[in-house]
Amino acid sequence: RQMCIRDRLAYSAKTRGQLRKKLQSEGFETELIEPLLDKFEAAKLIDDAEYAQTFVAQKSRTKKLSRTALRRELAERGVRGEEAENALAQRTDEQEREDAAELVRKKLRPGMDLSDRAEKDKVTRRLLGMLARRGYSSSVSMSVIREELAAYGAEDELW
């Protein structure tokens, strides 16, 4: 059984919490799970701190998730406390604002007529929803959306 678990670890990194759940679901006796996980940790087959660092870097880059969303996803994977907070510390407020602005810019298509108040409100609601799903606070979201809509309007006036 240990070989099968090692093969799984080689396939993709897992947290201690994920492995614990998997072993429980496969019928391992509870008193065997913790010593087995301790062995894997001692052999550096699992490392929650390293997993958290890699996870935060990857999800920040690919999905542009906020620290709040990243913290929630790490907790779902069994990484909490100091390990999670150390990994999240690599994200600054400025990076988070820039990521939110980039997401908003991607959604603002050329040729959108935002002079109509109803259309502008609809676009703002959709942008707020998109940022909220990625864990951005409403204050950061509104601030970024206002800035990007103003910049978008200024670009339209140039043409």
Predicted regions and their residues:
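An alpha-helical, amphipathic repeat domain used for nucleic-acid recognition
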Residues: 1-159
